[in-house]
C-alpha cells in the first residue's frame, strides 16, 4: 500500500482534520476503508464527502465491494447508511484476562511448534487453506506473510503451529499491542485445516496460543469473532473469553 496514492486527507482551516486510507484487495475485488476524523466532524457532511472520495478511489481500482468497520458507540452509522452502506456483519470483541491460563493437552500424534523466519510459505499455506472462501478473507502470498510476520507488533514466537507427522493442521497467529500503558496480547487469526476439522483440535491450538501470549503480555488477550459463528464463540467462552464490545462491518456495493 502506497500512502501517496491510497491515503486521502481532510483539511479544515489549513490543518489535517481526518483521513481515509483505501486498502485494495484486487484478488477478491474488495476495498477496505480505514477512516477517522476530528471528533467534532464525526458523522458530518465533511466526513461523508471524505468517505465518498474513498469510494471513488476504490472504484478506479476495480473494487466491486467496499467495507468499513465501526465500533458500537458511534453516531456515524446513520451517516454511512446515507452514503449507501449497509451493516453486513457484526463481530464480537472478546477478552481473556483470567489469572491462570488453560491447560494445553496435546495428543501424542500432534505437536506444537513456533514460527521461524523459514516458515512464511508454511504459514501462507495453512492460512489460505483455513480461510479461503470465508467472508472478507483475501488469500495471501508468502511475500505478504513474510512482511506481516516481521512487523513491529508481531513476534515470531507469538505464531504457533499445530502439526502431525504429515501436515500442518492448524495455527494461531498472535501479536502484541499497547493498551493504556500495558501490553495486550491479540489473537489476530486462528484456524484449522478443513481436512482436520471436527476433531477437537481448535481448543488445542487456542490454548497453546493463549499460553504463549500470556507469557509476553500483561493486560489480557483479545480477539474478534463473527457473531454468527456460534461454535467459535462457545469455544472461546469455554476457556474464559467474554464479550467486551461489538464491531460493525458496513458494506458498499458498486
Regions found by a protein language model. Name each.
Residues 1, 20-28, 136-183, 190:
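A conserved beta-strand-loop-helix scaffold within acyl/acetyltransferase catalytic domains
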Residues 1-52, 56, 172-183:
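Conserved donor-binding loop and adjoining core beta-sheet/short helix segment
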Residues 34-42, 71, 193, 197, ...:
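Residue-level recognition of the GNAT/N-acetyltransferase active site
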Residues 37-108, 250-252:
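Acyl-donor-binding surface of acyltransferase catalytic domains
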Residues 43-56, 189-192, 198-215, 233-238:
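Conserved acetyl-CoA-binding loop-helix of GNAT-fold acetyltransferases
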Residues 66-70, 187, 221-225:
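Conserved hydrophobic beta-strand within the GNAT/NAT acetyltransferase core sheet
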Residues 71-89, 203, 227-245:
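Conserved active-site alpha-helix within GNAT-family acetyltransferase domains
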Residues 111-125:
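A short beta-loop-alpha structural element at the N-terminal edge
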